[in-house]
Amino acid sequence: MVEEYYKADYDILAMTDHGVITNGWTSERETNGIFNKFRKVYPMSEENYERITKGLDRGGRGMTDIRGGIECNMAVISKTHVNGYFTTYGQGEWGIENDYRTAPVEIEKAGGYSVLNHVGDWVDSGRFPHRSHWNVYIAYFAGIFIDCPSCLGMEIVNNTDRVTRGDRDLWDELLQVVIPKGRNIWAFADDDSEKLNEVGRSFEFFVLPENNEANVKKAMKD
C-alpha cells in the first residue's frame, strides 16, 4: 500500500488501519485477530524505507512517514470512525456505538491529534442532505471541537464522496458556531483506501518549509 502511494506521487502518508497503531512502516504491528482476518503484517525493509522516504528513485522527493496513525472505533456498526495521529491510544479498542466524542478525548490525553471521519455516514446526509443543517448534529459536533482542541477537523471528502457529499454544509454550519468562540475546524479529504484500486481518490495540500514529520504535525494544527 505504501509503495502504491509512492508511485501515485504522494509526498506524505499516514497509515490509519482499523484499531491498529502504525509506528512507522518498518515496525511490527499487532492486528486484531478475527476482525483483521488474521492478516499477517509485513514491515517494510530498511532498504525500501530509505528509498521511499528519501525519494532515491524520484529525484530526491521523499514521502514522509507519519507515525502514530490509527482509525479508532474500529468495529462499530454506526461507523463513527475517528482518525488518530501521533497517538498511543486506540490499539485493539473496539469502540462505542454512535459515539464520536470518546476517541478524540482519549487521543488528546495521549498527546495526539484526531480528525472525525465521514460524519455523513452517521448523519446519513449523503441520502438526506438537509440533516446537515439539523441543530442536534451541529450542537453535537461543535461541542466536540470546542472541548477538544486537539481534534483538528473533519473529513469533508471521503473516498468517492458518496457519504460525505453533505458534509461541506455541516462544516459550514459548524464554522459559524465555533469561530466566534476562537476555534477553527480544518477540512480533510482522505482516500479511506482498503484496496489498491482505491488509492489516489482524495488528498490534501500542505504548505511546508520542508517536508518532514515535525513540519507536517505543525501544519496540521496551524
Each model region followed by its residue ranges:
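Charged catalytic cores and adjacent phosphate/nucleic-acid-binding surfaces used
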Residues: M1, I77-T88, P129-D222
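A metal-dependent hydrolase metal-coordination microenvironment
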Residues: M1-P129, I156-W171, D190-S193
